[in-house]
């Protein structure tokens, strides 16, 4: 008998609740590297409601956004703020280019940080971002 998907951690649940109530674009990646949520404000920049695809791997999500350096050169997902927060377990900030599902290339600033619980266990990554024009 299948036990279903693993339960989400309390810090991740609370982060999702925070994101759902903010006008700041935000997305969440769990400790397994799965994109588990992005809020309505993020939908405007990403170009598609979260409910249309649901949870997907962060690698797949990053590939679909075709992330690039400010000058348009390729950007390794590991070097994105979310990648640094996930792999190096530290906050990161960067200006980059992303192409939303709507095909629009945008210059965005992204800040991401690891989400640690009270026991220092990493529960995932929180990223906030905003379009900067240019």
Question: How should these model regions be labeled?
Answer:
Residues 2, 120-132:
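PAS-family sensory domains
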Residues 5-34, 40:
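Sensory modules in modular signal-transduction proteins
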Residues 32-33, 103, 118-121:
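A glycine-centered beta-loop-beta connector
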Residues 36, 75, 106, 122-123:
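Generic structural signal for well-ordered beta-strand positions
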Residues 43-44:
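Sensory helix hotspots in PAS and closely related PAS-like folds
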Residues 53-100:
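Terminal output helix/cap of sensory domains in signal transduction proteins
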Residues 93-95, 104-110, 126:
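PAS/PAC sensory module
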Residues 100-102, 111-117, 128-131:
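PAS-family sensory domains and close relatives that share small-molecule sensor folds
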